[in-house]
Amino acid sequence: MKLSEFVKAEYGKSISECTNEELYYALLTLTKKMASGKQHGNSKKKLYYISAEFLIGKLLSNNLINLGIYDEIKEELAQNGKDICEIEEFENEPSLGNGGLGRLAACFIDSIATLGLNGDGVGLNYHFGLFRQIFENNMQTTVPDPWLTEKSWLTKTDVTYDIKFKGMTVKSRMYDIDVIGYNNTSNKLHLFDVESVDESIVEDGINFNKEDIKKNLTLFLYPDDSDEAGRILRIYQQYFMVSSAAQLILDECVAKGCNLHDLSDYVVIQINDTHPTMVIPELIRLLVERGLEMDEAIEVVTKSCAYTNHTILAEALEKWPIYYLKKAVPQLMPIIEVLDDKVRRKYHNQEVYIIDGEERVHMAHIDIHYSSSVNGVASLHTEILKNNELHHFYEIYPEKFNNKTNGITFRRWLLHCNPQLTELITSLIGDGFKKDATQLEKLLDYKNDEKVLKQLLEIKSAKKMELKKALMEKQNVTINENSIFDIQIKRLHEYKRQQLNALYVIHKYLEIKAGKKPSTPITVIFGAKAAPAYIIAQDIIHLILCLQQLINNDPEVSPYLNVVMVENYNVTWAEKLIPACDISEQISLASKEASGTGNMKFMLNGALTLGTEDGANVEIHELVGDDNIYIFGDSSDTVVERYAQGSYHAAKYYNENAAIKEAVDFITGEELKAIGDKDRLERLFNELVFKDWFMTFPDFDEYVKIREQAYADYENREEWVQKMLVNIAKAGYFSSDRTIEEYNRDIWKLED
């Protein structure tokens, strides 16, 4: 059905007579109708991809692209004086995720559907997400981030389950979002919500009564866990998600004729990080309840589950006190004790026990012992897991460990966010790359084609203008579109080292003040949210915002250097920032970033990576070669060794390196104190000088040197654009379609 006919039937008027809001809701309804007619994966075995987050982004354009009607709709709207981008402004971005974990899950379910595989996502229907970030007085403040409207991509289902906690039962209801594959199957994202949820209990900012479980359970993603009530709420939340999922899985299996003894022939559960771990003991509990012996239930569940590890950070490998679990979900503890007892009888090594000497349950240990597969998400990360962090487990289960390097959906991160580049690529090599991203390699034939290289630069300039316009409209910030766009966008964490980037900005500011001006102006752009309880991360944001105010208002410096921090960084912002970027900052401390996927998105859009040998940067480096990437910093081996020996002392670097001392002293100098919060700046200064846990200082000199090298190379436009082309051509490996094909081949074994 043409849009004009649908609009006529819906509103009784033509497209040109409709408001943009009416057209948005018409397109929403039409798209959902078309998705419902798509075939769902129907193999005997089904995947359930369980994740605490799905950072899916706005869905309208993405769904129209995947249905194959985007160009047709865009053209029909344009003929009636309507702009699809303006219509999309009426869509709220779903507040269902925060960082790379959630974005990866979103890319994966897109690829699962595109490949025609039988697999659904399972998560929670958060009402307010993490939070909406607002900058006030150069500080991050937090308010709820509502996204649910009466009409949305969510469809309420009749599926409900009783979820039993200690002393109470709550009802969960399933809501579905269609996951439309590219010219293929349509699957589901199942999101569970508590029926008794009450948005009105949120008070000032994002504060609420953490103990009112019946009302608060699905309000926020990752509720503040700086106190006991917050930590126990996380257990309630996680159990609510996995108990709903487990009941759904068993119901769907029985409906297919499965006798539960053969569960693993019908089901594979991918556990995305440790948040869904309790699905293992919960499934065992339910199977025993339904008549299986304990040992058989354990065996069946182990065969059915697979675990993805996303981090080596100890803080993120969840360990819950037994006391918390008994307070919230006492019915799970007998199962967990049985699982631990089995491990203790077999392996006499307390490093691999599930319950430790401090009466804590290690969630990752449950996942490793009672899953059939354990995977890392980049080759370096997987090697670190095998040789260091999870070495004791690797010695026990070498056959379980495997690598699945992360990927991204090219539908969103190229076709949707950079249609100009998509059009150019299609004109050169055809559209086969849309289904087989490795075909991008054909672009290498054009490495010396002046016309093509000129078009690439023109597209980059156009995307810079679009970003300039967006920043002006959204934040009233002006940037120079002819400057180098140097961008770091990711969750705020010390290991990702936004503080290193900020120290470089100070260094550059002082250089310009001393008369050393760059040949081409530089715009340094940040986007990041800091967890409300993560004080130092908030202090780093404060420093960046103070630098933004200081530098952008300095007439001596601002013609050459600008700093911008985008407010409330999310997928929608990423879609504007990534195509406009020249230099992609991927500067985590080597060994700490499992993979990263922002690095892949930037590469695909022709940005050059400036980074450490960490995560997927290693594989990008291998693909593009030394000449097309900017690598600096200590190796992961050096870093791991330094931690092991306890040999790093930040104060020594501070006292012995004049450039470091000058930049760090500036944090508490008069200029910043005049506009910033003295306590925050001093706390950050002390953290860097006396702790610097993520080793900013050892990499500082090399970082300055390589960044200056990148800026110098940018001056040679012909060579720079050739580097851009090589990066785009080599990005095909990082398609999430490739990643999902590997998961299916090695772990899931679904028929397509």
Language-model-detected regions and their locations in the chain:
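A conserved ligand/cofactor-binding region detector
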Residues: 1-752
